[in-house]
Amino acid sequence: MIQPSDFHTTDTALVLVDHQVGTITWAGELNTVQRDQLKTYVTFIAKFAKAAGMPIVLTSSLETEAQGLLLPELQTALPDEYAKRVKRDGVINAWDDPNFADAVRATGKKNLLMGGLTTDVCLVPPALSAAKEGFNVIALTDISGACTKRGAENSVSLLHAAGIPTMTVTPMVTSLLGNYKNPASGAFFELMGSLGILTLMQGGDVL
């Protein structure tokens, strides 16, 4: 199995699947506080990746239906990537949409950090497909949420069985840095403070 230490800011892309205003309400395993924390962590990884110069691919599904637009936090943090997002017309496994798969391939990175809403429907299928194609994938569980707690458990089992590790954002970012002398560390520490990540850690976050 690949290890987080194999991923670096210079060889990794961030892929966010269906973090939409309607879809987040379908993450039934999460309560309101946990959904707010998810928004904080997805903003954290998005802003960090942008500051570190990592390629970012966004995709959404059926924006004019109940799923809605991507989270406002992502629209604000990633205006350029939001403008280039892959808007799927109903394809459930994002990897089955050639525009999405080609956008990921076009990053030129073989290491992918992936998160999705919901975990069981929107993250697992494209993560498995990307891994099957030969990408190294790590799934970020605190920017993902399943329809049910059982769905979350099954999702992690499927990912692990396919050799895809699961991580949370903060330790994954420190692993990407490798050394606090990394130039991207400035963004890391600034975001830890400005987004209240340190406060969440000190208070014992619930994700």
Predicted regions and their residues:
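Active-site acidic carboxylates
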Residues: 1-89, 136, 153-160, 177, ...
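Short acidic-hydrophobic, aromatic-tinged amphipathic segments that line or gate anion-handling sites
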Residues: 86-87, 165-171
